Design a protein with these regions (language model features):
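Short, low-complexity, Pro/Ser/Thr/Gly-rich segments in the mature regions of secreted, periplasmic
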Residues: 170-184
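N-terminal secretory signal peptides that target proteins for export/translocation
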Residues: 1-3
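Solvent-exposed adhesion/ligand-recognition segments of exported proteins
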Residues: 27-28, 183
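Sec-dependent N-terminal signal peptides
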Residues: 5-14
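The right-handed parallel beta-helix/beta-solenoid scaffold, focusing on the short coil/turn
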Residues: 27, 34-36, 42, 47, ...
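N-terminal signal peptide c-region/cleavage motif recognized by signal peptidases
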Residues: 15-20
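Sequence-structural signature of mature extracellular/luminal beta-sheet repeat domains
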Residues: 21-23, 74-77, 156-160, 184
Length: 184
């Protein structure tokens, strides 16, 4: 029997065993988990946690990531979340951080590493990003809450378009700075 056939049979016999489990978060969450869901209007704090999957913030939900927290996947708030605040001194995001339609102040503070991209699109809440390493692109498009970008390292591009007001800041290093990010 080949390995593929063995895995197929195992998957058929134990369908839930190979799938990541979702943990609902409303309050403080520590320890190891697969995917984490922040339900509508819930306030979740990940503190010294290790996630094998991603974090999903639902409409009106709020997420704070503190301490030595590692998220293997993405942090996604694209359904009108309240905010995402990453305040730990050693937070690692293995994928992307995506925020869309958030309406409160969002912040990513020094000591944070985002291996993928930071995408901040059509938000009415302000964004503060200071002393962050981003392994791919930083993209800010069509935001109305303002953004301050200070002393960040972006491996690829800083792209800022159609933000009112335009982002402010200085000391950022990027492969290429485009449009409203050019002077930052």
């Amino acid at each position: 029997m080949t390995i593929k056939k063995s895995l197929l049979i195992l998957t058929m016999l134990v369908p839930g065993a190979l799938m990541a489990e979702d943990t609902q978060c409303n309050g403080v969450l520590k320890g190891s988990h697969d995917n984490v869901i922040v339900p509508e209007s819930a306030v979740c704090t990940l503190q010294n946690a290790r996630l094998n999957g991603s974090v999903y913030v639902k409409r009106g939900g709020a997420l704070t990531i503190q301490g030595r927290t590692y998220v293997n996947g993405n942090v996604i708030s694209e359904d009108g979340g309240r905010y995402v605040r990453i305040t730990g001194t050693n937070v690692r995001i293995g994928g992307n951080v995506q925020m869309k339609y958030n309406y409160d102040t969002n912040a990513i503070q020094p000591g944070t590493t985002i291996q993928g991209s930071l995408q901040y699109v059509e938000n009415t809440g302000a964004l503060f990003v200071t002393g962050v390493f981003i392994g791919s692109d930083l993209q800010l498009f069509k935001n109305s809450g303002g953004a301050t970008l200070m002393n960040n390292t972006i491996r690829q591009n800083m792209q800022c378009k159609e933000n009112t007001p335009a982002p402010s800041g200085s000391g950022n290093v990027a492969g290429d700075k485009e449009d409203q990010c050019r002077a930052l």
